[in-house]
């Protein structure tokens, strides 16, 4: 799912996600761990109480939001 992301990048390439927008108003997220592979940078975020994976694709420099398999709501 395409998503708009407001973030900053550190000198080491790490991302700090501030908020995301999915066709509605901007929503603040809590950020977890992140990693990079040959295809993308991956960042775990908490959105509406559910953990999602934000993916910045290296080939298009676009963000995608993915639900994690077996993802559950946190209370």
Predicted regions and their residues:
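Cysteine-centric segments in proteins
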Residues: 1-75
């Amino acid at each position: 799912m395409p998503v708009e992301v407001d973030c900053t990048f550190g000198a080491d390439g790490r991302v700090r996600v501030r908020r995301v927008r999915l066709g509605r108003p901007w929503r603040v997220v809590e950020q977890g761990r992140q990693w990079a592979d040959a295809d993308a940078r991956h960042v775990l975020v908490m959105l509406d109480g559910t953990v999602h994976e934000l993916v910045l694709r290296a080939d298009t420099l676009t963000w995608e939001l993915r639900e994690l398999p077996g993802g559950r709501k946190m209370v």
